[in-house]
Each structure stands twice: as structure tokens, then as C-alpha cells.
A protein has these predicted regions:
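Beta-rich, blade/repeat-based domains predominating
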Residues: 11-25, 54-70, 96-113, 142-160, ...
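Hydrophobic alpha-helical segments and helix pairs
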Residues: 85-142
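A short beta-strand motif characteristic of beta-propeller blades
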Residues: 4-10, 46-52, 88-96, 138-144, ...
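Blade-level signature of beta-propeller repeat domains, shared across WD40, Kelch, NHL, RCC1
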Residues: 239-291
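A short loop-to-beta-strand structural motif that recurs across blades of beta-propeller domains
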Residues: 37-39, 76, 128-131, 170-172, ...
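Short loop/turn segments that connect beta-strands within beta-propeller blades
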Residues: 42-46, 81-85, 133-137, 175-179, ...
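Conserved beta-strand positions in repeat-built beta-propeller and related beta-rich domains
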Residues: 22-23, 28-34, 70-75, 116-124, ...
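Loop/turn-rich, solvent-exposed surfaces of beta-rich toroidal or solenoidal domains
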Residues: 170, 186-223
Length: 291
């Protein structure tokens, strides 16, 4: 049945995020940002391993080298080798000693650039940015005056980019030309804050809704197709996975929840796998020529 949860993993993530499917190894990867851990799940047996990281790992993409990730740590962009722990810094964007702002949500674009937005963690003036890291190493800023950058996704033909500044509760879309020109795509309900997102093979946008305990699927025209309930208060990110890319995998978070809320629902902070009637797209690989 579409939307049925077939499996869940409960590592009690403080802030599960950045979930990515690696079709080459048939593994699912995600991060617990605040827990400073990278998780990897083998699809064939659901076995999960975890790797500690030296600073908060906020988002990552796959590269043409299966042993390396293109990573957005809290302070900047780097190549990261999970097996060895090696980090090769490319750009430092923030200072770990001034934690009011850090990198946050990120996705590989169809244009082979690694797009990442940042977040203001102390609720001061919106001063976060949207970055794109090119294969030649160039880092460009495409938007500023952001509070919490989230919801990055790309149409299958690579013509459009989706984005949300979460507190505004509005998903936006722009044609992927320079300069980007943003237009309203969808507005969420009062209790639903759009977080991480993914786009399926048909061009539908799937948005994890923090605070609403669900994932909402939108057609390319912004109308709602369906909503899948998630047994966690704060779904945070999603992606399609599995050999046929027909399973929607959703991370969640415990951060900000009370001890009572967690005791009443121990699945808070879990990663959920749902069977769907939709199919995702393989991840774009960051080119190896710069590795």
C-alpha cells in the first residue's frame, strides 16, 4: 500500500538530516547534525553503521569517487572520506567559534553543482545565504538575507530549482538561470514548516513538514497530490531509495521536544522507509576531476 511504513531505524537523532541514496553500493546515508554522526544503512539487510565526525556535518552529496563525499560541514565545504576520516577543506564560510550561523540543507543539482544554504541559529536578523559550489571549485552566492535555508530540489530536466526559507512557510521556485528569479510555489499550513525536500521522476516535489508529522507531495504546478503521515513530530528531510527508487526515506529530529513528548513517542528522531507508487531519480555525482 502506498505510504505504508515498511521499516524504521531509531538512532534517536537529535537532528536527522541530509538523507541520500547511493545506487552504486545500495546504501542509504544521512547525518545527525547535532550528534556529529554520519549514518549508513545497507539496503539488503537494513544494517546501520555510524561514523563520528569532528564538527557538525550538515549536508553532503555523492562524488564520482565512491569513497568520498562532497560535504557541507558547519563551517564550510570540504571533501570527506568517511572510511578514513580525511577532510580536505575547499572553502571556509563560517567560524566554529561564532556558532550563530552555519551551513544547513544541501543537494546536488542537475547542473552538477553542490547547492547549500545556511541557517541563523540564534534567531537574530536573517543573514544566511544560498551557495553553489561548482566542479571547478568556484563558490558563488545566489541569495542572502535568509533565516533558515531548506527545501532544495531540482526538476528532472534541470531547468528549475526549489527553495524555502522555512520560517516564511512558503516554497519558492526559480528557473535555473542567472540571476535567479524566485516565485511562490506553495504555502504551507500554520503548523507545517517546510524542511528538506526531493523531486521524483515525474517532477513532483516532496517536502518534509517540520511540526506537522507528514511529507507532502506537490505537482509541478504547486497543487497537492497527497500527504503521507510520519509517526514523528518533526520530519526533516526525504529522498527516494531502493533498487527501483520507489521507497521514500524520511529523517526526523528530537531537538526541541520535551522529555514527555519523547517518552510518549520513542520513534521521535527515527528514519522511516515508506513504500510508494512513485519513483525517484538517481543522485547526481559531483565530478571527480577536482578530487
Amino acid at each position: 500500500m502506498s505510504g505504508e511504513i515498511i521499516h524504521s531505524v531509531n538512532p534517536a537523532n537529535e537532528l536527522g538530516e541530509g538523507i541520500v541514496w547511493d545506487h552504486r553500493s545500495q546504501t542509504l546515508l544521512w547525518t545527525d547534525i547535532h550528534g556529529k554522526k554520519l549514518f549508513r544503512m545497507q539496503w539488503y539487510n537494513f544494517e546501520v553503521t555510524e561514523t563520528s565526525v569532528p564538527e557538525r556535518l550538515c549536508a553532503f552529496g555523492l562524488t564520482e569517487n565512491p569513497e568520498k563525499l562532497i560535504a557541507a560541514f558547519e563551517t564550510g565545504f570540504a571533501y570527506f572520506s568517511p572510511a578514513t576520516g580525511e577532510i580536505k577543506w575547499l572553502h571556509k564560510t563560517y567560524d566554529v567559534d561564532t556558532p550563530q550561523i552555519r551551513l544547513n540543507d544541501g543537494r546536488m543539482g542537475r547542473d552538477k553543482r553542490f547547492w547549500v544554504g545556511s541557517i541563523v541559529e540564534d534567531d537574530t536578523a536573517p543573514k544566511a545565504k544560498l551557495y553553489a559550489l561548482s566542479p571547478n571549485g568556484a563558490l558563488n552566492v545566489y541569495r542572502d538575507k535568509i533565516a533558515i535555508a531548506n527545501g532544495l530540489g531540482f526538476s528532472p530536466d534541470g531547468q528549475y530549482i526549489y527553495f524555502t526559507d522555512t520560517p516564511n512557510q512558503q516554497i519558492e521556485v526559480s528557473k535555473l538561470t542567472e540571476p535567479l528569479k524566485w516565485h511562490p510555489f506553495a504555502t504551507t499550513e500554520t503548523h507545517a514548516y517546510p524542511d528538506g525536500a526531493t523531486v521524483d521522476k515525474e517532477g513532483n516535489l516532496w517536502s518534509a513538514e517540520w511540526g506537522a508529522g507528514r511529507v507532502t507531495a506537490y505537482r509541478p504546478d504547486g497543487t497537492v497530490i497527497l500527504r503521507y503521515p510520519i509517526p514523528a513530530t518533526q520530519p526533516s528531510c526525504c529522498t527516494f531509495a531502493g533498487p527501483d527508487l520507489k521507497y521514500l526515506c524520511v529523517t526526523s529530529a528530537r531537538v526541541g521536544l520535551s522529555e514527555t513528548q519523547i517518552s510518549e513517542n520513542p520513534k521521535e528522531g527515527s528514519m522511516f522507509i515508506l513504500k510508494t507508487d512513485f519513483a525517484g531519480l538517481p543522485e547526481v555525482l559531483f565530478p571527480e576531476k577536482t578530487l
